[in-house]
Swiss-Prot record:
Species per Swiss-Prot/TrEMBL record: Chlamydia trachomatis serovar D (strain ATCC VR-885 / DSM 19411 / UW-3/Cx)
Protein name according to UniProt: Tryptophan synthase alpha chain
Subunit comment: Tetramer of two alpha and two beta chains.
Gene Ontology BP annotations: L-tryptophan biosynthetic process
Catalyzed reaction equations: (1S,2R)-1-C-(indol-3-yl)glycerol 3-phosphate + L-serine = D-glyceraldehyde 3-phosphate + L-tryptophan + H2O
Coiled coil spans: none
InterPro entries registered for this protein in UniProt: Aldolase_TIM, RibuloseP-bd_barrel, Trp_synthase_alpha_AS, Trp_synthase_suA
Pfam families, per database record: Trp_syntA
Entry's Gene Ontology cellular component terms: cytosol
Active site annotation, chain numbering: 44 (proton acceptor), 55 (proton acceptor)
Molecular-function GO term, any one: tryptophan synthase activity
Length: 253
């Protein structure tokens, strides 16, 4: 059982997001420490990209700031190692678009693993479209011991889920239907159908901003993720202590 799957066995979890390099290498390390101290159970680090179209404007700007700080694949490793020097237990996920990882070879993926990354979520790289088709990148992740964190949605068919099963490890991100996301009955039914196909933990991918919304999501999801609220806080106040306080106000007691 992977470390990510194992940690979900203990409780329902909060995943906290930071864009790596936003504010500089040292700041990202200190911000990560602050979120962990605030109670974040899993940390997701965004690999900056020049065209992060799947993210909202505030997250996109954080990518721009990180690139302006000259965040590279090597300084990303330094950030991961810096976080691991502080905490060896909290799982770390790399969130990326495929382009920044496209030219990285198996050795770099192995270095990510050795530095302390546990899983990789590539937002714009789907699982293969047919049985028998292979995904070289997902194969490489598995070869070095990194969990591919895949995404499914309300529109994912049972046939498509069977293809995703081949590579999904750690947990799954679920993107709910807009029409049912605020209906507890509707969203619970969506999750029930997904759980018929997967033994993995399933996390609602919507971007949580407060404790009430987090508590609602935890009624049916194995966890929740906070992205924009944490990124916004880093732009409002360079003091990382405020991140600890913010995490404590978002995570249900």
């Amino acid at each position: 059982m992977s470390k990510l799957t194992q940690v979900f066995k203990q409780t329902k979890l909060c995943i906290g997001y930071l864009t790596a390099g936003d504010g500089g290498t040292s700041y990202t390390i200190e911000a990560a420490k602050a979120l962990i101290q605030g109670g974040v159970d899993i940390l997701e680090l965004g690999f900056p990209f020049s065209d992060p179209v799947a993210d909202n404007p505030e997250i996109q700007v954080s990518h721009d700031r990180a690139l302006a700080e000259n965040l590279t694949s090597e300084t990303l490793l330094e950030i991961v190692e810096g976080i691991r020097a502080f905490n060896q237990e909290v799982p770390l996920i790399l969130y990326s678009y495929y382009n920044p990882l496209l030219q990285r070879d198996l050795d770099y993926l192995r270095r990510l693993k050795d530095a302390g990354i546990n899983g990789v979520c590539v937002i714009d790289l789907p699982a293969p479209l047919s049985h028998g088709e292979k995904s070289p990148f997902f194969e490489d992740l598995l070869a070095v011991g990194l969990d591919p964190i895949l995404l499914i949605s309300a529109g994912t068919t049972p046939e498509r889920m069977s293809l995703i099963q081949e590579y999904a490890r750690g947990f799954l991100y679920y993107i709910p239907c807009q029409a049912t996301r605020d209906s507890e009955v509707g969203i619970k039914e969506e999750f029930r159908k997904v759980r018929e196909h997967f033994d993995l933990p399933i996390v609602d991918r919507r971007d949580i901003c407060d404790k009430k919304e987090a508590a609602h999501v935890l009624n049916y999801s194995d966890g929740f993720i906070v992205k924009t609220a944490f990124v916004h806080q880093t732009t409002m106040d360079s003091s990382v202590e405020t991140l600890t306080a913010l995490a404590q106000t978002v995570i249900p007691g």
